[in-house]
Structure formats: structure tokens, C-alpha cells
Curated annotation (Swiss-Prot):
Pfam families listed in its UniProt record: Cys_Knot_tox
Protein name: Toxin ICK-16
GO cellular component term, pick one: extracellular region
Lineage of the organism: Eukaryota, Metazoa, Ecdysozoa, Arthropoda, Chelicerata
Highest taxon above the source species: Eukaryota
Principal subcellular localisation of the protein: secreted
Organism per entry: Trittame loki (Brush-footed trapdoor spider)
Any one Gene Ontology molecular-function term assigned to this protein's record: ion channel regulator activity
Family membership noted in the UniProt record: Belongs to the neurotoxin 21 family.
Keywords: Disulfide bond, Ion channel impairing toxin, Knottin, Neurotoxin, Secreted, Signal, Toxin
Length: 92
């Protein structure tokens, strides 16, 4: 029983640390608009340098959007990605 609990705990911890590839909120409805500089806003999961580059959620009361640093295991460092998440979520 102890090994099973240890394995489950390890798996849960790995998911929390590494995240899921689609956890930036791509499935949440968002508006793709043209920015003042002529470029299109960046969708969730795209690289960004500031929050104003990222597409906003259609429901701005329930969802928040922005540019945040996340750990990339593939690159071995932090990257800034656009995301959309639920305002009430502790991960937002």
C-alpha cells in the first residue's frame, strides 16, 4: 500500500510542477484582435513579453488573461507565455 501511495504522490507532484501542455487556457473563448502596432494578439500558449500582447477572454468577469513566466522543462529555464485562467482559481 505504501508504494502505491508514494507513486500517486509523485505523479501528482510531477503534474503540479510540470503542468499540462494545454493549461494556458487555449480552449477558453477569446477575442483575436489586431493590436495598435498592426500585429495580431497572441493566443494562449504563445511567447510574449508583456500582457498587452495577449488576447483577452470574451468573458472578462470570469476569466483573466496576461503574460506570465512559466518553467519550461524542455528549455531548462523560464519562458513568458500568454495565458487565460479562471479568476477564482488559485493558479491564476
Amino acid at each position: 500500500m505504501k508504494p502505491i501511495v508514494s507513486i500517486l504522490l509523485f505523479c501528482a507532484l510531477a503534474v503540479v510542477i510540470m503542468g499540462h501542455p494545454m493549461n494556458q487556457g487555449y480552449g477558453i473563448p477569446h477575442d483575436v484582435v489586431k493590436l495598435p502596432n498592426g500585429q495580431w494578439c497572441k493566443t494562449p500558449g504563445d511567447d510574449c513579453s508583456k500582457s498587452s500582447e495577449c488576447c483577452k477572454a470574451k468573458d472578462t468577469v470570469t476569466y483573466s488573461s496576461g503574460c506570465s513566466q512559466e518553467w519550461s522543462g524542455q528549455l531548462g529555464g523560464f519562458v513568458k507565455l500568454c495565458h487565460i485562467c479562471n479568476v477564482e482559481s488559485s493558479m491564476c
